[in-house]
Amino acid sequence: MSYAVKYKTNKGEEEMKKRRVAKLIALSMVAATLLTGVNVQAKEEKVVTAMTSIDLTPELCDPIKSGPDFRLYEMIYDPLVRYGENGEIKPALAESWDISEDGTTYTFHLRKDVKFSDGTEFNADNVMWNYNRWVEQDVIGNFSAKLENVTKVDDYTVEFKFAEPCYTLLIEFSYPRPFRFTCESALDEDGEFCQEVGTGMWMIDSYESGQEVVLVPNPNYYGEKPNIDKVVLKQVVDGDARVMALQSGEADLNLQDIPSESFSIIQADKNLSTEQQVSTLSYYLSEN
């Protein structure tokens, strides 16, 4: 189970605050036990300030890299498919898919209304561009089965062909990395990653590496629009400091574990309440 801590709202704004918190939690897709908190004080701007103890280094947030910023990956980059509320696989960039009887071929039918945050269209050509980059950067070995090739069937259909059955592919595509999608404008003239360009609900507005990242809604997002104007992620390593920030109203949400002895303090604070939700964990064995 994972735990959440949130402030009780004042002045009749409880429902509005709950919606803000629920949206941020959904975006974060936290995959481990954690405590969260939400500030009661209403702000003129619709801003949520969240804290994490992991390194915030968006300059390294290349979707094919295994950086620590998995929450940024979830907010900026979309997968072909994603986990639903009950652990079932749901459409994302792919609106539907077909699996061959032998489990070696997956055909994905892409949405036709998707654009990246810079306005670039997402389509089969973009999937092929990303696939070629996976090959060049030697990340296709992350699939549980050997990927033989990817083929463009038409402008919005792609086919993944494996050497043997890959029954876990949909689960693997739901992971934050390394198989999410960016576009050519994310790379500099030397082919090196230089900026975060994705199809997700959020895009980076500004950041101070190792300190904070400010995200704003992606104006080209194809799905439901967020009902907040800005998310500020702050890197706060010390657990006690995160608790104090929640109590003072400096921060709204804690996305990391806090000291166990602080749980009673949170429970005793009338401006804080706790929530529980089922978390998803993936276990795997690898051979040397």
Language model regions located:
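Short, low-complexity disordered leader/linker segments with a strong preference
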Residues: 1-47, 61, 88, 149
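Aromatic- and charge-enriched surface segment that lines or borders ligand/interaction sites
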Residues: 95-137, 159
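Ligand-binding "clamshell"
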Residues: 144, 263-276
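Ligand-site clamp/hinge motif
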Residues: 219-264
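Surface-exposed binding/hinge segments that line
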Residues: 98, 102, 142-185
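Gly/Pro-rich hinge or "lid" segments in bacterial periplasmic/extracellular proteins
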Residues: 84, 88, 174-226, 230
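N-terminal lobe/hinge region of extracytoplasmic solute-binding protein
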Residues: 51-101, 132, 197
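A bilobed periplasmic-binding-protein/Venus flytrap-type ligand-binding module shared by bacterial periplasmic
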Residues: 216-221, 279-288
